[in-house]
Amino acid sequence: MKGTGIPVQEKENGAPDTVQENGGPDIRTEERLAYFIRMLSDDNDTNRWKAAELLGRMRDPDAVDPLIDTLWDDDSRVRLKAAWALGQIGDIRAIGPLRRLYRMENEDSQEIITEAIEVINLRTGQQ
């Protein structure tokens, strides 16, 4: 039986705009996830940044690998938003790549990366 969807945002660039009211799996949520993962490869850096932001807010572990790939984006804003998103998801798989990125970034960027690592450690009970 298909659940009733509730609007979460106006459609933009064809993105699905509903989620299941009962919080269960919903094809629309899966479509949104796939859409935002595709947007991580968009030519427009602002679209990539927004996609990373939204994936972080969704907190879906299926976004971890694509976000890890995004840590090497040419645009530093996109890289840092991907680092933030990985912290929000809280998956231990992101720790190694975040540490590698840390060594490549400036001091200001390192603060954001450190915060993401700390959030992951808190969420997973790591030290």
Language-model features: where?
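Amphipathic alpha-helical scaffolding segments comprising HEAT/armadillo-like alpha-solenoid repeats
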Residues: G3-I6, D26-M39, D60-W72, D91-R103, ...
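Asparagine/serine/threonine-enriched low-complexity, disordered tracts
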Residues: T4, K11-N13, N22
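HEAT-repeat alpha-solenoid elements in large eukaryotic scaffold proteins
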Residues: V8-P16, S41
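Alpha-helical segment of the N-proximal tetratricopeptide repeat
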Residues: V19-D26, E31, Y35-M58
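Short inter-helical turns and helix N-cap capping residues of alpha-solenoid HEAT/ARM repeat scaffolds
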Residues: D43-N44, D74-D75, E105-N106
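Conserved hydrophobic register position within alpha-solenoid helical repeats
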Residues: A51, A82, I113-I117
